[in-house]
Curated annotation (Swiss-Prot):
Any one GO MF annotation of this record: chromatin binding
Gene (UniProt): ARP4
Species of provenance: Mycosarcoma maydis (Corn smut fungus)
Biological process annotations from GO: chromatin remodeling; DNA repair; regulation of transcription by RNA polymerase II
Oligomeric and partner information: Component of the NuA4 histone acetyltransferase complex, of the INO80 chromatin remodeling complex, and of the SWR1 chromatin remodeling complex.
Stretch list, region Disordered: 59-116
Name of the molecule in the record: Actin-related protein 4
SUPFAM superfamilies per record: Actin-like ATPase domain
Length: 534
């Protein structure tokens, strides 16, 4: 029998982890408390450093049975007055100061021991002799040869379970909660593998120590957050665009369509356009960490910037790529827009430009390039045959490149070596065609309901004009259908829709009988997730 939990007394934790970012918070709240990048940094660690951490962590064990110096025996009967007098006398002398200092040192050593113990448990990979770092502050801090890697692969499935466990622990620490005291709800993509589902289940019970667990589908949660039991969920994420039909709360898997031309494909298109459309005035995207100083310049003129050459030489390619992608992503969110009608060069030329300033001081009004890049979603054929470097580091400020990377930028063109198609390959189809293909793949009786309940979510769906363009194209391609697109105007609701749906679900009293309990996990193993979480 499944474990039954009361809805009123349980305060569940919700973690919604995507390829780009992960959201952590409490069930029943209307926004996540913590949003973290779904990446981790790692550097090598020596045996001596590991031994030092073990030495610090050992203090927690050795001191657990030791009475803290500040503790004293409780006064008995009428001795309270005498004890208070002695304490006052001692505090006024050197003995009191020494005792206070000793207690302070003891607490400091305990805190360090606890931190070292957690570092050894979550952050240190003894086999590969490396230490991991998670969180915005750690990933933004420059370290020589720090590598940055994604926790999830391009399909949104778990790539590094140890790094994800560390990310979850970091997020839960930010909430100041003990994971062993709260049920945990995790989310997953509709195409998640059996192996990945079992890894997540093991992580919840074995690593985090959760008393109960549930794995919910991200698309169903987005539909639930929109208040629709049946809908077509369009998720424009960082690496994938997917259209998923949901009828009465169940995914119709034969109607799932997805392509890898998501937000990062738009970033690649923007980067390509900048380097091929700006000319000599634009020398490259310069991340913040290499800038020593800069001066203001007029719009459209080259940046006047002094770089930290030791950081240019000392940064790894993955660290450089990560930070250049952050700059390009901010550029996209600030200026990118979708043309309201199918792509037309003349119409794009007449649209007004939008000002943007890069970290190195280069600024200008950007016009056609900010419109053309978003066509990756609707007209991917426009970008067929155009390659952009897989590593954003290939287009770092040209003047800062070490000689070994000089071939990456040659005469203003991006090298095709190690390149990937901007639009995710020739097989990609436009977003409107994906919607029609998904709906046509389901039963005829369900189609009208899906046309009238299209839910648009995902961080990259916030690009201006995307919803209007999709509505226009669907109206042209399916003129006899009543089409209604639900796209929340609230940024939080659209960007974090699956987390919000999970928050609502996990707070319902009727849901708590569905949790997988620790006892059930111990009896049936991780495979129970396939039977209980469908």
């Amino acid at each position: 029998m499944p474990g039954v939990y009361g809805g009123d007394e349980i305060n569940a934790l919700v973690i919604d982890a995507g390829h780009s970012s992960s959201r952590v918070g409490w069930a029943g709240e209307d926004a996540p408390r913590v949003v973290l990048p779904s990446y981790y940094g790692h550097t090598s660690i020596t045996d001596d450093a590991i031994a030092e951490l073990e030495s610090q962590a050992a203090f927690a064990t050795s001191s657990s049975s030791t009475v803290e110096p500040t503790e004293r025996a409780e006064p008995v009967d009428g001795d309270e007055t005498m004890a208070d007098g002695q304490a006052l006398s001692t505090s006024n002398g050197n003995g009191g100061a020494a005792a206070t200092q000793e207690a302070s040192d003891h607490r400091l050593r305990q805190a360090r021991a606890k931190s070292a113990s957690k570092t050894l448990r979550f952050s240190v990979d003894r086999e590969k002799k490396r230490r991991r770092f998670v969180g915005d502050n750690e990933l933004n801090l420059y370290r020589t040869n720090l590598e940055i890697a994604p926790i999830f692969d391009d399909d949104g499935m778990l790539a590094d379970a140890s790094a994800f466990a560390q990310l979850c622990s970091f997020g839960l620490d930010s909430l100041s909660c003990d994971a062993s005291e709260h049920p945990l709800l995790l989310t997953e993509p509709a195409w998640n593998s059996r192996e990945s589902r079992e890894k997540l289940t093991e992580l919840a019970f074995e690593t985090l120590g959760s008393p109960a667990f549930y794995l919910a589908n991200r698309s169903v949660l987005s539909s639930f957050a929109a208040g629709k039991p049946s809908s077509l969920v369009i998720d424009v994420g960082s690496t994938n665009v997917s259209t998923i039909p949901i009828v009465d709360g169940f995914i119709l898997r034969k109607g799932i369509y997805r392509h890898n031309n998501g937000g990062e494909a738009i970033n690649r298109a923007l980067l390509y356009s900048l380097h091929h459309g700006r000319g000599a005035t634009f020398a490259g995207v310069t991340p913040q960490y290499v800038i020593k100083s800069r001066s203001s310049v007029d719009p459209g003129t080259p940046a006047n910037v002094v770089l930290r050459q030791e950081r240019v030489q000392g940064a790894s390619s993955s660290f450089r790529s990560y930070h250049i992608n952050r700059v390009v992503n901010d550029f996209k969110e600030s200026v990118a827009q979708v043309l309201e009608v199918p792509w037309d060069d003349q119409q794009a030329q007449f649209r007004s430009g939008r000002m943007y300033e890069f970290p190195d001081g280069y600024n200008d009004a950007f016009g056609v390039e900010r419109l053309r890049a978003a066509e990756v979603l609707f007209t991917p054929a426009l970008w067929n045959g155009v390659s952009s470097s897989e590593s954003f580091g290939a287009v770092l400020h040209a003047s800062s490149q070490p000689s070994s990377e000089a071939g990456a930028v040659n005469g203003g063109s991006v090298s095709a070596a190690g390149a990937t198609s901007v639009a995710g390959g020739k097989a990609a189809i436009g977003l409107a065609d994906m919607v029609l293909s998904s709906i046509n793949a389901v039963d005829v009786d369900s189609r009208p309901s899906l046309y009238g309940n299209i839910v648009l979510v995902g961080g990259s769906s916030l690009i201006q004009g995307l919803s209007d363009r999709l509505s226009y194209e669907l109206g042209v391609k399916a003129p006899n259908q009543k089409i209604k697109i639900h796209s929340p105007g609230n940024t939080t609701e659209r960007r974090h829709s699956s987390w919000l749906g999970a928050s609502i679900l996990a707070s319902l009293g009727t849901f708590h009988q569905l949790w997988i309990s620790k006892q059930e996990y111990e009896e049936h193993g991780a495979a129970i997730v396939h039977a209980r979480c469908k």
